[in-house]
């Protein structure tokens, strides 16, 4: 829940001016700014998406935003299961899977987030947690999981002063890759993004890992120069 009309306009203008082809970029913005984002990025080659969607197609769900509504604004992607949604809104694995299915039904690519908390990490439960979370989506979608993007967010490495090394991140990505390959013949081509405090100074080493296909960039995306540099590192 960051940004304003003025700061967003400046950020998007810089991104559009400085971005060049070589990496796929999707900017997921707060819903009130979707119209302005679509206008700003139209024809640029940069895609845009939503930060969440409802598990329902329509109806009396005041305050929720359907995947179909996002699609009407030209969105190509939507984030589901972000760690903040799971922790602050109590979203279950099953609900996240339902949201992913609804996104796909509306022609969007769901960016499915998985990741363990600090206590789960310290208890050695990383594998069990991320596999459980991703398994719920695979169970719901079946082989259609190949149309998703997966994002690994080590929650313990976000705002805690602790960091996941590229090697630690790669180890988890490799386990997620193995699970995806067991569910789809296209498992090797499903993109797995890393979302644990991606910054200019660690992006290149992270993206050099075999199973890290890009980044789910948080705070660094609020600074246009940093975000452009990270996008360049993903080429």
What are these regions (language model features)?
Residues 1-235:
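Active-site loop-to-helix "anion-binding N-cap" substructures in soluble metabolic enzymes
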């Amino acid at each position: 829940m960051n940004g304003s009309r003025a700061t967003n306009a400046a950020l998007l203008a810089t991104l559009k001016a400085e971005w060049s082809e070589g990496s796929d970029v999707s900017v997921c913005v707060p819903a009130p700014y979707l119209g302005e984002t679509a206008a700003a990025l139209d024809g640029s080659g940069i895609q845009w998406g939503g930060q969440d969607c409802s598990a329902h197609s329509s109806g009396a769900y005041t305050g929720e935003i359907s995947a179909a509504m996002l699609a009407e604004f030209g969105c190509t992607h939507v984030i589901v299961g972000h760690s903040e949604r799971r922790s602050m809104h109590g979203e279950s694995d099953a609900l996240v899977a339902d949201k992913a299915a609804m996104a796909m039904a509306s022609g969007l690519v769901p960016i499915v987030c998985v990741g363990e908390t600090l206590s789960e990490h310290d208890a050695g439960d990383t594998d069990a947690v991320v596999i459980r979370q991703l398994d719920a989506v695979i169970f719901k979608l079946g082989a259609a999981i190949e149309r998703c993007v997966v994002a690994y967010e080590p929650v313990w490495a976000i705002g805690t002063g602790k960091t996941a090394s590229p090697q630690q991140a790669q180890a988890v990505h490799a386990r997620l890759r193995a699970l995806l390959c067991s569910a789809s013949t296209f498992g090797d081509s499903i993109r797995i993004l890393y979302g644990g405090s991606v910054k200019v100074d660690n992006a290149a080493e992270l993206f050099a890992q075999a199973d890290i296909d890009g980044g789910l960039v948080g705070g660094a995306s609020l600074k246009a120069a940093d975000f452009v540099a990270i996008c360049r590192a993903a080429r």
